[in-house]
């Protein structure tokens, strides 16, 4: 008989598999992918109902941090999807409302179900091995792309040799690979260290270099630097040396945040970067709109980028400014509060379980860094959120009994 954990892993993997190809723009099955999301949510809800009847499902009597975060996400969606709708933007807002609604349903139900069944291991494992299957398949079926990889051109300001292994945009492949590497680190550090997972990490690294996605590569570097920064206490250093190293790491991260994804030299950054239009066009348009508190209206980055709205903005390639411009001061305040909630919870987790807390902070820092260059911030149209947001939500309330508890220990505590 298949266990509930097995059913969850299978359906969660199917959801991720469909999302990977849909968001990549290469989904070819005749079935409407939205039905897969609806079916997935329906299955988990039905299983939860059965568990409640059998008294196998934990019902919390008090509001958890995860519940508060979920309410903020839902509140943002409801406020700007149904209340503060800009009439000229209504058709675009409706599309966002549907996409974001399905996304939130899938992610929040996943997090709640996994947390209350103690399936954190299953979430990490299903994500890692689903991506592994996709990358392996795409690598084999597009093997000729390997010959076009040119590592030396990754930082070339004029041209880069880039391949996508059949997965849409190069940056999409880069994001998928960087996420796979981080998930692999979680698995190898806390669950197992088999050679197959190491092989998958190596494969993802090769494909990441092929994508030549600077955002993804620098995001991984930020992850590594943040993890090292908080791991310094494990090593014997004089305080002055430790302080110098920590200041250096902070400086490197700040420099990368400012210049990491630029397409040009540092000297010509503000003059030539495509993202300069955020400050020269998009923000002035926003401030002149008389909608600074509630924003210009929800619409995808592509709609704004092609100036299909009544407002001239060009591409809003920054998750924070995108949130400000589309949902105003109220919207950005909600998301900033959500970010602070995550950071405070992970800091508390670090004090209780150093290894888990450090990985949580490092992974979330990479996520925040990536939002500097793309509209990834809690965006249902971005695969990164399907892969990491359930993990982020579960970790909000994760508390270990001892410092040495690992993901393997979590797997032992089953109902």
Q: Language model features by range: what are they?
A:
Residues 140-142, 228-270, 283-288:
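A membrane-periplasm/extracellular boundary helix in multi-pass inner-membrane enzymes
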Residues 182, 361-370, 376-415:
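Transmembrane alpha-helices of multi-pass inner-membrane enzymes
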Residues 266-327:
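Long extracytoplasmic/lumenal interhelical loops at the membrane interface
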Residues 1-55, 76-84, 367-371:
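N-terminal signal-anchor transmembrane segment
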Residues 67-78, 89-113, 122-128, 132-135:
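Aromatic-anchored transmembrane helix interface
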Residues 64-65, 194, 221-225, 229-233, ...:
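Hydrophobic transmembrane alpha-helices and their immediate junctions
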Residues 122-149, 166-230:
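Alpha-helical transmembrane segments of multi-pass inner-membrane proteins
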Residues 119-126, 193-197, 234-247:
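Membrane-interfacial entry segments at the cytosolic side of transmembrane helices
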């Amino acid at each position: 008989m298949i266990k509930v954990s097995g059913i969850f892993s299978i359906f969660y993997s199917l959801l991720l598999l469909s999302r990977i190809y849909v968001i990549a723009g290469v989904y070819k099955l005749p079935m409407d992918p939205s039905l897969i999301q609806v079916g997935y949510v329906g299955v988990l809800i039905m299983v939860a109902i059965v568990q409640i009847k059998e008294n196998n499902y934990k019902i919390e009597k008090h509001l958890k941090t995860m519940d508060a975060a979920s309410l903020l996400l839902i509140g943002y969606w409801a406020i700007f999807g149904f209340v503060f709708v800009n009439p000229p933007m209504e058709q675009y807002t409706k599309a966002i409302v549907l996409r974001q609604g399905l996304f939130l349903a899938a992610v929040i139900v996943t997090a709640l179900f996994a947390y209350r069944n103690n399936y954190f291991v299953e979430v990490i494992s299903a994500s890692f091995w689903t991506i592994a299957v996709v990358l392996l398949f795409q690598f084999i079926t597009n093997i000729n792309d390997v010959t076009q990889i040119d590592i030396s051109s990754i930082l070339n300001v004029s041209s880069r040799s880039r391949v996508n292994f059949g997965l849409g945009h190069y940056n999409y492949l880069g994001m998928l690979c960087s996420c796979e590497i981080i998930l692999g680190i979680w698995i190898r550090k806390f669950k197992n260290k088999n050679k197959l997972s190491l092989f998958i990490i190596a494969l993802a690294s090769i494909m990441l270099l092929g994508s030549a996605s600077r955002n993804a590569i620098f995001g991984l570097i930020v992850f590594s630097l943040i993890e090292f920064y908080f791991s310094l206490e494990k090593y014997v250093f004089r305080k002055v040396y430790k302080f110098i190293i920590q200041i250096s790491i902070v400086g490197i991260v700040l420099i990368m945040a400012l210049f990491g994804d630029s397409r040009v030299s540092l000297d010509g950054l503000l003059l030539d970067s495509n993202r300069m239009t955020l400050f020269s066009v998009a923000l002035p348009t926003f401030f002149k709109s008389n909608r600074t508190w509630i924003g210009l209206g929800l619409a995808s980055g592509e709609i704004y980028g092609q100036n299909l709205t009544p407002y001239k903005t060009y591409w809003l390639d920054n998750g924070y400014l995108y949130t400000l411009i589309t949902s105003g001061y109220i919207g950005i305040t909600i998301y900033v509060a959500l970010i602070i909630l995550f950071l405070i919870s992970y800091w508390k987790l670090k004090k209780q379980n150093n290894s888990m807390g450090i990985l949580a902070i490092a992974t979330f820092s990479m996520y925040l860094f990536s939002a500097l260059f793309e509209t990834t911030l809690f965006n249902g149209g971005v695969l990164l959120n399907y892969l990491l947001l359930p993990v982020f939500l579960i970790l909000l309330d994760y508390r270990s009994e001892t410092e040495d508890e690992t993901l393997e220990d979590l797997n032992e505590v089953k109902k």
